[in-house]
Amino acid sequence: LVLRHPEQHIMLMRDKTYAQEMEYISTNKTRNLFISKLVASQEGNTLVLAQYIEKQLVPLCEMIIERCKENREIYLIYGATPTDDREKVRSLVEQNENAVIVASYGTFSTGVNIKRIHNIIFASPYKSQIRVLQSIGRGLRIAGDKEQLNLFDISDDLSYNNRENFTLKHFGSRIEIYNQEEFDYEIIPITLKT
């Protein structure tokens, strides 16, 4: 999913650094609201991965809880979550059909084996081939009730004139990975409203 941001935001972001772009993206309420709606629209166990805990992960989890609390179990996992609690969540999700895990890339891209992940949402842009493939690998585990994995790779189009923004370039790198791995994918442009 390629999110085209409003023109006034693009104008403000056109000369910003990578760090400033990531700050804008991770704290953008409209973007996070879109992600929370996407989570609510999916069936099956959903893993939402984000990079910044305080800036994005926690506020995004709160939005998801507000939207989904009536019919889904929602778990927040990041570096400070004790190993025993992570294992409890893993066990609960294996037994659940419609749970949501909101986690940091660092805690869930490697070393966690949950077979019943039906959807993965990359809520933060990432470029590392190893981390991208390891994150996708969380959902490629075989489970009896799962025929496919839906990956929602959220990218942000803040390009101005002929200049692509940093995170859109990173999306291009992830597309190269998807092509190398021969994944089926579709790029869907979406216009964010203010």
Feature locations, PLM:
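Long, largely alpha-helical accessory region at the distal end of helicase-like NTP-driven motors
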Residues: 41, 45-46, 183-194
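Hydrophobic/aromatic beta-strand patches that form the interior of the parallel beta-sheet core
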Residues: 1-2, 75, 121, 152, ...
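Conserved RecA-like P-loop NTPase helicase motor core
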Residues: 79-180
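Conserved interdomain hinge at the start of the Helicase C-terminal
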Residues: 2-4, 8-69
